[in-house]
Amino acid sequence: MANKKRSASSSRWLQEHFSDKYVLQAQKKGLRSRAWFKLDEIQQSDKIFKPGMTVVDLGAAPGGWSQYAVSQISDNGRVIACDLLPMDPIVGVDFLQGDFRDELVLKTLLERVGDNKVQVVMSDMAPNMSGTPAVDIPRSMYLVELALDMCRDVLAPEGSFIVKVFQGEGFDEYLREIRSLFTNVKIRKPDASRARSREVYIVATGRKL
């Protein structure tokens, strides 16, 4: 019975995915993923990216956010991206494949960032979802805490942080933590984010000294 339910749910997801207007637009424009549109909407409202910036992209594959960031920071900007999954090359993106939770991968990522601080850290990381919120939410919160730790390590004063978070247990506490570190914090639900999804995007600007 459980397999039948999972099969029906998977079929429903596939049908919804391939009829999604943002998926269709992404395919038409040759974009890596529909996530490109989420970041574009955030940029239109919050003006995060500027030419010459250095950006760290966590959970980058298949590359929608990296692709968008490169288009905004111009040739003298830089994107350093990391994901457990492989990602086809993008001009202007330094990609590291590996598990961000692994100490060796984190060390390599920090070496690629170098001594200079970055202007933006963004994370679209999400765990493999089981469909059980009691399992999925803690896994998700662990990843977003790691992303915030990256901000503490590499983000410049006045820098910005964009992170996907699934609403549930621990969300309010995480939001308070971000507010203690940044001057301006907003919660965004882009149109390209499916309405029934628990995901929201926290956009934090003005990292405090």
From Swiss-Prot:
GO CC annotation, single: cytoplasm
Pfam families according to UniProt: FtsJ (PF01728)
Entry keyword Cytoplasm: yes
Known catalytic reactions: uridine(2552) in 23S rRNA + S-adenosyl-L-methionine = 2'-O-methyluridine(2552) in 23S rRNA + S-adenosyl-L-homocysteine + H(+)
Catalytic activity, EC: 2.1.1.166
Record: active site: 164
Keyword rRNA processing recorded: yes
InterPro entries reported in the protein's UniProt record: RNA_methyltr_RlmE, RNA_MeTrfase_FtsJ_dom, rRNA-MeTfrase_E, rRNA_MeTrfase_gammaproteobac, SAM-dependent_MTases_sf
A GO MF label: rRNA (uridine-2'-O-)-methyltransferase activity
Subcellular location: Cytoplasm
Top-level division of the source organism's lineage: Bacteria
UniProt: S-adenosyl-L-methionine binding residues: 63, 65, 83, 99, 124
Record function comment: Specifically methylates the uridine in position 2552 of 23S rRNA at the 2'-O position of the ribose in the fully assembled 50S ribosomal subunit.
The protein's name: Ribosomal RNA large subunit methyltransferase E
Organism for this UniProt entry: Photorhabdus laumondii subsp. laumondii (strain DSM 15139 / CIP 105565 / TT01) (Photorhabdus luminescens subsp. laumondii)
